[in-house]
Amino acid sequence: MKLAFLYAGQGTQHVGMGRDLYETYPAFREVLDSAPVDFDLKQLCFDGPEERLNDTRYTQPCMVAFAAGVTALLKDAGIVPDYAAGLSLGEYSALHCAGVLDAPTTISLVAFRGQAMADAVKDRPCGMAAVLNLDRDTLKQVCEEASHAGVVECTNFNCPGQIVISGDAAAVDRAGELAKAAGAKRVLPLKVSGPFHTSLMAPAGDALREKFQSVPFCEMEIPVLFNCLGDLKGERDTIPDLLEQQVQSSVYLEDTIRRLAELGVDTVVEIGPGRTLSGFVRKTAKQIKCYPVETAEDLEAAIAALKGA
């Protein structure tokens, strides 16, 4: 068996996430209780309100704390991956898994990232939408045609048949209309609060570059595949540049999954609320087995299956 941990990004968070893990496992509880944030993280995860949980300033530390807690539980059970990767925000969780950042530093860093991303488009109506069943080249052309209404770009190449577009709200709406006219099956607005991975995030990239100067990045203990490459990168010194680039450029998750398959990965543990990434894996490399871990029951089932493999 060759194993990868794949970490969820924003959009799958929901009120109640992590409650049973918190009640069941002291190691998970410790991560959430010690999160270095200026709000009650566990209360927001468990009880909401949903509107606040969906605000990127709060979504990011909540998601990463959840992921760090699950990672600790898996490693405590002797489950250590051969590779790690994540979707967007999940890349920070992958770096934590790989030993590059400890849990408090990772949570604090993504809280800063969330604020920087919110500040980058403050008072600017923006959005993201998933476009189904339209190829990359056609959708890129659609975005170019819609750009008279504002910034709109292809930002997440998730799997065959699903690409996310982001940008100014009017331009995203126009691109959605053009995409449907070009043959897209559906256009689905996403539950996020900003035009992530577009050029509109350049100010956030600048803020992160400055922030990274005081962040202690360690060597990777586990190889990480990076979003903006869809591939491995081994040098510690390149990590800040890749993370700065990531916030304002496209995420190549489909390419990442294909690369994992090329590397011989046959099993993936999806860490985060929901089962979205497992769906992307099945559509991209159906030979890979997926074990989504969101609940205590999921965790127990995954550990039993992986230890028996």
Report residues per predicted region.
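Short, flexible loop segments at boundaries between secondary-structure elements
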Residues: 229, 289-309
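Alpha/beta catalytic cores of group-transfer enzymes, especially the acyltransferase/condensing modules
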Residues: 11-12, 36-39, 98-249
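Short, solvent-exposed amphipathic alpha-helical segments in soluble enzyme
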Residues: 22-23, 145-147, 180-182, 283-286, ...
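A short, acidic, amphipathic alpha-helical segment used as a generic capping/interface helix at domain edges
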Residues: 248-265
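FabD-like malonyl-/acyl-CoA
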Residues: 1-139, 190, 267-297
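Non-catalytic positions within long, well-ordered alpha-helices that form the structural scaffold/packing
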Residues: 75, 180, 261-264
